[in-house]
Every structure is written in structure tokens, then in C-alpha cells.
Amino acid sequence: MKETNSFSQKLKQFALLFFPIFVTQMSLFAMSFFDTTMSGHASPIDLAGVAIGTSIWIPVSTGLTGILMATTPIVAQLVGSKKKEDVPHVVIQAVYLAICASFVVILIGLFTVTPILNGMRLEEPVERIAAQFLSIIAIGIIPLFTYTVLRGFIDALGKTRTTMIITLLSLPINVVLNYVLIFGNFGFPKLGGVGAAIASAATYWCILIITVMIIRTKEPFASFNIFKQLYRPSLSSWKEFLKLGVPIGFAIFFETSIFAAVTLMMSNFSTTTIAAHQAAMNFASLLYMTPLSLAMAMTIAVGFEVGAKRYNNAKQYGFIGIGLALAFALLYSILLYFFDDEIASIYTTDIQVHHLAKEFLIFAILFQISDAIATPVQGALRGYKDVNVALIMTLIAYWVIGLPLGYILATYTDWAAKGYWIGLIIGLAFGATFLLIRLFQVQRKYTTQNSRS
């Protein structure tokens, strides 16, 4: 990152931040995408089992990686304020937290996964695949969480192209392992959805190994000497980190778990409905990688400018990110409307699943505008280290408004499973409105301070 003077310079620098992040997020998502699509072509039961497994795994993993994402704004502000010498201590303490969090998640999972799945009253084959999926994916928790911290450090320096290269190097491993293990090619046993979990866990370890090697040997990362000194664990540092990270993590958890909760509630419907819902939700999540990538770029850009006390520049980056997100939302809405049949065909050859997935995809169009506002706005707020109000807003929008309304519509109207999608859409719209108002308040506060000084 460097200081910019004109709007065009900011737009160019933001694009250079965003594009590698976008490729990285798409590549990471591609692992889940290939898990879902390839499992779906194995059988509808495998697709449903992976759907249930990921609906439990994704909120946990994204919520905790969200906590660890606090590395990015902290390091970005340190670099912006020319405090490079403080960076190694922050990163190592975050790595310690990541490892501790990994063991806690694994321990809790040992005692909770089976009761949760038993309580869902799934068909026996679906429950078995979901349980095996979760047991195996746990092997990849430690590398995934540790990589999240190290990626936050790399991205905070504005070197988002590096994380892009790391992920692109790892993606082919995931695809090949999926092909071999899901379908039983080259003499390996046919494992179906369980093979997808093995492939993802192995890929997470590959990503971590590559990242550590780059940080140790390549500039500008090597000059920070991140691994030169293993600092003693510092509870005070953990407390400061968690003060920022926990609201970020829970805000992400509330947003992602609402979709997972809907998937779990879909267990009351048929396997066909679960599979169709998962297919449509998976593609909607694919499109979500764009506003998410814009949000991550905004955290870096806004955090850097706030650290340097250039608050007007930070405000301009906010407008750039939201504007780009709305433009992409329009493009994706057109794509969903005109190519719903082709999109559904990617996920399944089953006629009933295909038809129902097309109906769900139409609802995904309405997700686009809300995501284009809410997600980048949260990225900007993280750059300001303003996270507590966003946490409360997301809780209310998704869990107080969206999910209860969806349940009512699905249970007491003819909308059935589609009622959950309508509830999600309304919850997302409220969340986008609340968060945008908060961003304006924060920007006004900082620009007022700037004018007074």
C-alpha cells in the first residue's frame, strides 16, 4: 500500500488489491464448489450428506477464521502508522490463538456432532455421510486457522497477489484428490462425499506449508522476521486481539450460520429439496465471493489510511468498494435470470432436483443487492476497527428478523421451503440498511476529527 492523491490512483490501487483477493477467494470457494458438484454427480444422497456436513462446518470455520481476520486491520494500521517492529509479535500471538482455537473446536466436535445429527432425523445414509465428512474435515482445522492468520499478515502489506498464487498452486491438488477419492478412480476406493472431506483437509495442509515457506524466504515478508523469535504467549495481547476479532467473528458467524440454519431446517423436507437448496445456495455463495473480496480489500485500504490519519482517503475507498459491488450485483442478477437452467445443470442430472434448484436460483437474484451493500460496508467498518455495533446489527437482522420470518412463511404458508429464502432476503435487506447507516456515522466522526485537527 502507498499514499494516493487522486481518485483514479485510488481506483487503480484498489483494483490491484481486489483482483488477487477475488481470485484467492474464488479458488478457496472452488474447493467447496467441487466438493458439492462432484458429490452431487456421485449421487443425490452424497450431495445431501455433504450439504448437511458443510452446513455445520462452514459457520464454525468462518466464524473462527473471522476472529483471526483481525490480523489484517491490526497489521494494516501498524504499517500505515510506521510501526513495523510491532508486527511480528502481533502475528505470532495470533498464530498461538489459532492453534488453541483449533483444539477447542475439535474437542467440542467430538461431543456434539453425533447428538446434532441424531436430532435432525435424517435418512440413515445422509446422516452417515455427514458424520464422516465432519470427522475427516477436522484434520484440516489447524492448518486452515493458522493460514488465516498468515494470510492476514500478507494481505495487510498489500501483497494480495501472493495469497492468490498460493491458492492457485493448491487448487489442482484438491480437484485431483476429489476426482480420485469421490469416484474411486485409479484403483482408489469410491468414497463419495467422504472423499471430498479428505481432499479438502489435505489441501489445507498444502496451503499452510507453502505460505510458511514464502513468509520465511521472500521479501518483503522475510524482512519482518515473523518466525525468527517465538514470543511467549501474552494474555494481554490475546485480549486486545480478541477485543477486535470476536465481534468480527461473531458478525460473520451470524451471517453464515443463518444460511446453515436454513439448510438444517430443510431436513424436514425431502432429500430432493435438500439437494436442490444446496445447489442453489452453493452458486449464490459463489457469487458472494465478489462482495466478500471487495470487503477484504476495503479493510486493507481503509485500515492503512486510518492508520496514517488520512480519513478523507479512507472515506473515498468506502465509496469505491460499494460502487463496484453494486455494479457486480447487477451483472450477476442478469446471469441468474437468463442462465438458471444451465446453472442448475452444473450441480445435478436428477430432473426433480434440477427443476427445484432453478426455482431457488430466482430467489438468489434478490440476494445480490443486499450483499453488495452489507458485505463491503462491514469490510470498511473493520478497517476503522468499528466492529461492535455491526455485530449487534447483524444479529438483529438475520436472527431476530430473517430466520423467524422464514420459519413462519415455510411452516404456515404455501411457500413451503421457499419461505426460508424469502425470510433470508428480508433479513439481508434490513442488515444492509442498518450497516450502511453505521458506516456513514463512523465516516462523519473521523472526517470531523480530521477537520478539527
Curated annotation (Swiss-Prot):
Location in or out of the cell: Cell membrane
GO cellular component terms listed in the entry, alphabetical order: plasma membrane
UniProt-recorded Gene Ontology molecular function terms: antiporter activity; xenobiotic transmembrane transporter activity
Nucleotidyltransferase keyword on record: no
CDD domains xrefs: MATE_NorM_like
Chain ranges passing through the membrane: 13-34, 49-71, 92-114, 129-151, 164-183, 193-215, 244-266, 286-308, 317-339, 359-381, 388-410, 420-442
UniProt entry tagged with the keyword Transmembrane: yes
UniProt KW keywords: Antiport, Cell membrane, Ion transport, Membrane, Transmembrane, Transmembrane helix, Transport
InterPro entries xrefs: MATE_fam, MATE_MdtK, MdtK-like
GO term, biological process aspect, one: monoatomic ion transport
NCBIfam families the UniProt entry points to: matE
Function description: Multidrug efflux pump.
Protein name as annotated: Probable multidrug resistance protein NorM
Organism: Bacillus thuringiensis subsp. konkukian (strain 97-27)
Taxonomic lineage from the root: Bacteria, Bacillati, Bacillota, Bacilli, Bacillales
